Amino acid sequence: IYSLPFKENYFDLILCNHVLEHIEDDNKALNELHRVIKNKGILIAQIPLDKNLKKTFENKEIINRRDRNKYFGQYDHVRIYGLDFYKRLSNSGFKPKKVDFLKKISTKEKIKYCLPKDEEIPVGIAIK
């Protein structure tokens, strides 16, 4: 994800579904996604977002599975995103938007598909 084999301005849409919380340098990855997306292209960046955190929690010294599970909620995560994720999108050249798709889904569907009650999906519109 740091060096994708595509030319600049290649994609109209990129779906990055639960990837960024697993990689060491998410800013480098976002910059690379911006490179390969067209102007006004859409990046859907689904991540675990804790709306109670103003700032993303990450600590490079937390390296073993037990501690990562304890602090990040999963052994292979390297951070928990806070509300500053939208600023990270902006810093990489995207115009950030929040999409609350759950308002459009019935309670029955939320239960059927085990969806969280208040998930927000960050979307970035590429600005070039």
Where are these regions (language model features)?
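A short SAM/SAH-binding and catalytic strip from SAM-dependent methyltransferases
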Residues: D12-E24
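S-adenosyl-L-methionine-dependent methyltransferase catalytic module, highlighting the catalytic core
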Residues: E24-K38, I42-I127
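A short acidic, Gly/Pro-enriched loop at the edge of an enzyme's catalytic core
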Residues: Y2-I14
